Amino acid sequence: MALLWAAQGLSYIGDQIFDTTLVVWIASVLAKDQTWAPLAVSGVLIAVAIPTLVIGPLAGVFVDRADKRRMMIATDGVRAALIAFLLVSTGVVGGFRPSIEVQLASIYVVVFLTAAATQFFGPARISLVRDVVPEDARARAQSLSQVNASVSTIIGPPLAVPTLFVLGIQWALVANALSFVISLGLVVLVRPPAQPAHAPPGAAPSFMRELREGFQFAGRNVVVRTLLVSLFIVMLGGGALNALDVFFVINNLGTSANLYGFVGAAMGVGVLVGALLAGGLAGRIGLNRMYWMSLLSFGIFLLIYARLTSFIAALVLLFVVGFPQAAVNVAAAPILMGATPRELLGRVFSLVQPISATASILSTAGAGFLATSVLANLHAQVGPVRIGTYDTIFTVAGLLILAGGVYAWNNLNSAYGK
């Protein structure tokens, strides 16, 4: 497990450096002072979103058919090669500097293909974790994975900008490529137990049938369906926070946008601390209870956050919000592993990211629409409570997350007879 944990950590940090570097590189170098710069940056986000939504659900079929360790090795190798190709295609190395249009096109293609490869890596890693980690240690393993994600979020972006402007874009890309190469080497050293090959009796492999089997299992199994539906509901609320929090900080908390970075840092540290604590908490109260209790806590905290007017109080609360956010992430994967047969795990897990991304996109678009149209000029007073645009949207978001928690509470307790 230590090798998988180290490999994942390196990949996460490399991804954070890569993502941040590309955005800053496009905005401050390739598209500097251009009116189309925001559109160029948005192209990176679109290039990530498309494979997540389209390829993600399909990747699980191939993951379930393949050797999980070899799949991880192959995807790490592909991603390292793609980053190396980007060094050449953008003229960063080699002496030839193509036009801005060619450089941007190269970036979008590489980002798209890298994101596509990631859709195979994630389900393969989860399946391999299931093979090498005993059931009673999976919460602890997922807690360490969440620590990886939190640390990479905290240190990755701050490393990216100095690397870009002090050492140059070439070293930022090389660092990302090396992270995949080292991750590949660590996965090579993993020795999972032998597993019987899965082949449906009396039937030749059929992509559509196997894809349908994954969807049908996710729809029929109460535990899996509950996790996927509750995650969708929660992300409908969480997407609004991601989209509008900077405006809430400026308008409701009366704080300069220059201090907005502390908001993400406060929640990031909270998630890190929560991840360290969640493994032990799961052992005491159980994964299922930790999952729905964390969703309910997250919803309540967001309702409180919507009423705040103090920036310091908001930072403290966001630090606390990180605890249930980490606990949800720690609990979800082991619950899925326990409820899903090994031969279907890749297909089931590959639904998580597309479902979360779809809900987040809908929430972001809906919140942005409400904030700029229907609720744009909302100013009201109900007793001592002032009601405005952003706190109203966050209140609705908090209620959605609460609804997701109640749904999970009811269904998981019913499924496990509690």
Give names to the regions the model predicted:
Residues 2-22, 44-83, 105-165, 175, ...:
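Substrate-agnostic recognition of the 12-TM MFS/MFS-like secondary transporter fold
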Residues 21-32, 86-99, 155-175, 251-252, ...:
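Transmembrane alpha-helix termini and helix-breaking/packing motifs in multi-pass membrane transporters
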Residues 88-110, 304-318:
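Helix-loop junctions at membrane interfaces in 12-TM secondary transporters
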Residues 1-2, 192-229, 418:
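Juxtamembrane intracellular "pre-TM" segments in multi-pass secondary transporters
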Residues 93, 125-132, 173-203, 223, ...:
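Helix-loop junctions on the cytosolic side of multi-pass membrane transporters
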Residues 21-52, 258:
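Extracellular/periplasmic helix-loop-helix junction of adjacent transmembrane segments
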Residues 42-47, 54, 65, 71, ...:
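C-terminal transmembrane bundle of multi-pass solute transporters/carriers
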Residues 1-5, 38, 100-108, 210, ...:
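Primarily residues marking transmembrane-helix entry/exit sites
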